[in-house]
């Protein structure tokens, strides 16, 4: 018989002969309070291993213990809890409820409801929705969705705009988003109640129609009602903070907040400094755009200057002002002046920008993993409308539902519609929420089709749309992926010092990468001159002088106006167009003591 190895927090500490008895005894001691209730034990019989975990930071959740087919939590316990005679900790210390981690759940058989409990079951869920975390717990009717959609939504909830902190006005976060009119979801769950999500929601209730519209909502694109946006739907503010410090340097030199003078090295234009006050700092509520100076600042030179004719060192300060980022604009929201721990002056400027979905490309998502970007913003008069004159805020494509099996969204729209007609909020808690048939009856009682479909009319022609359109109310979240932050174009701009190629990235006003696959497309088309233009002329074209004898890159002495080869000296050299990156490669090969020789031929 194989001995079973025992591990504590992954470390082998011994073996035992009767693993089942050992595990049962340890669990009994935990339930009686002899061993800490924060310990978990798991037996893997196929591997002959027992794992005991006491590590901090493990995810654990409470379950009701079942013995001989009977849950240990009785009606009398619930009454005592309600009256205050008992507390939650008493249930744990009395061995009625225990916390299990993911490892110990491997040894359990958990019943979802008291009716399901049999003698084989070891535990019972307090409520089926407790198996979900906070992010998954706010999804209504999550048990009707496929699991990848729920996982997707659990990630996207964290990206949704809302009231991220109630003291946002006093904070200077590097970047922050704030939704102007967050609403509590009409279809809620019990986890929403428990976590206080209603106090700081992160979305709005949209009237949603499921239909195609002129092909503009293909591939998860969304169509938004322009009038709804003008009334404040999905409107948000974006805050960005900038800061600068008057640093002190060895030798008594220091930075200064001021409006730089024209003699300062790196001086911009007068227009860039037009918003600054006398102290070099901008005033609140000033409109600013890309490149405007927010904090005027000068710094001492990095190196000592040459001694002038009077034998003194002339200090020529350099410009180090803080400017609005490239591609951003807004209004100065707040100016904070304070000191650092070292006693240096510190200035922080918060700029706010109002964001309304004006462009296509802003990202939205329902609570069922149905994410999409705005494909078209339509005037209200061109939107389809119902017999009662209701115009949807949002149109989603019907192809988004069947293959993804997000039936929870269909139920939420049904429940949202019923809730609006009855003036109440619907409980969409997974497994235990309101039944579909009750929602359908509520719709029927209010004069609607029980399936949630309605007749819609074309807003452009006024004709009745042949198909019945499913329309309801769903909670949608605006995510922080916005076109304003992503859109980018460049004609001319800075280049890198080393390679002389355009810089990379939107923040550095970089070029758009013309990659290998784009190059292959032009090769396939046979567009040789277009290829040369992209990869040479518009990138890092360099005219090198090449020695006709030895093939080494020659030198041009500007003072003497003379070309010569460093090896052959007086030999003839010719200009050759090459990429500067290639010239850099030749230089690096020389540093490795490899002599790259360029062989020149006459042009064909």
UniProtKB/Swiss-Prot annotation:
Active-site residues are 348, 481
Q: Where in the cell is it found?
A: Cytoplasm
* UniProt: Zn(2+) binding residues: 547, 550, 565, 568
Which top class of enzyme applies to this chain? transferase
Matching Pfam families, A to Z?
Answer: RNA_pol_Rpb2_4, RNA_pol_Rpb2_5, RNA_pol_Rpb2_6, RNA_pol_Rpb2_7
Q: Which reaction does it catalyse?
A: RNA(n) + a ribonucleoside 5'-triphosphate = RNA(n+1) + diphosphate
Mention one GO biological process in which this protein takes part, according to its record: DNA-templated transcription
Q: How is the cofactor bound?
A: Binds 1 Zn(2+) per subunit.
| Chain's role | DNA-dependent RNA polymerase (RNAP) catalyzes the transcription of DNA into RNA using the four ribonucleoside triphosphates as substrates. The Rpo2 subunit (Rpo2N and Rpo2C in this organism) is implicated in DNA promoter recognition and in nucleotide binding.
Q: Which family does it belong to?
A: Belongs to the RNA polymerase beta chain family.
Assigned GO CC terms:
cytoplasm; DNA-directed RNA polymerase complex
According to its UniProt record, which cofactors does this protein need? Answer: Zn(2+)
Q: Name one GO molecular function term.
A: zinc ion binding
**Keyword set, alphabetical order:** Cytoplasm, DNA-binding, DNA-directed RNA polymerase, Metal-binding, Nucleotidyltransferase, Transcription, Transferase, Zinc
Q: What is its EC number?
A: 2.7.7.6
Name of encoding gene: rpo2C
Q: Which Gene3D superfamilies match?
A: 2.40.50.150, 3.90.1070.20, DNA-directed RNA polymerase, subunit 2, domain 6, RNA polymerase alpha subunit dimerisation domain
Q: Does the keyword ATP-binding apply?
A: no
Which PROSITE patterns does the entry mention?
RNA_POL_BETA
- Provide the protein name: DNA-directed RNA polymerase subunit Rpo2C
Give the species this sequence originates from: Methanothermobacter thermautotrophicus (strain Winter) (Methanobacterium thermoautotrophicum)
